[in-house]
Amino acid sequence: QDSSLQSHAYQSGAISGMALLSQFVDWLSRLLSEQALPGVIATLLLALAALGMSHLFALIGSAVSDKRLSGRFIANINRLGLLVLRSVPEYIFAFVFMLLLGPSMLPAILALAIHNGALIAYLTIRHADDVTVSAHFNGRLDGYGYEVLPAIYPNMMALLFYRFEVILRETAILGMLGIATSGFYFDSIFDAI
């Protein structure tokens, strides 16, 4: 009788253990499908959109800040603007754009693109100053695109891919401002505690 009592206790423990495991698997699958997967997808989409806009901003910012293309005075003014834009944190831009545009992914994309695009353009244009151009350089956009841009573009892309990691991390953190990235779900978990 003692062995049957132990067997019954073992079976009830196994059943409750299996039920516990089943509940854990159900909870984990709900968590992954309802929060983790949508958060990761939104984070990646926002980061890739910000990366693309940062690239465009860096291309335009470096072109208008080149002394050979826009003149010394305007280039210096543009460089000062790039310096200011890269100095303002993404969170400040995101907060201001969220007040102006409402809560969506657009304020975060614009904030990340402006900050990182200005940073990359500023660093790239410093490299462009060292590029020597031929005697046939005409001082127009086509001359810039033919002689200067090919010389600075590999460095620009290296900086852009380096900053992608930062953009991805900042995208997750910007979720705490209410954008539905992975940071949003992390923040709501702490609110529930």
Sequence positions of predicted segments:
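Membrane-cytosol interface at the C-terminal ends of specific transmembrane alpha-helices
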Residues: 104-163, 170
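Glycine-rich helix-loop "coupling/hinge" segments at transmembrane-helix boundaries
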Residues: 99, 167-193
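Generic hydrophobic transmembrane alpha-helix motif, especially the helices
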Residues: 78-115
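Transmembrane-helix boundary motif in ABC transporter permease subunits
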Residues: 45-82
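Alpha-helical membrane-interface segments at transmembrane helix boundaries
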Residues: 37-45, 78-85, 165, 187-191
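Hydrophobic alpha-helical segments of membrane proteins
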Residues: 48-59, 92-96, 152, 156-175
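Periplasmic/extracellular loop-to-transmembrane helix junction in inner-membrane transport proteins
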Residues: 1-49
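Transmembrane alpha-helices and adjacent helix-loop boundaries
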Residues: 46, 70-72, 87-93, 105, ...
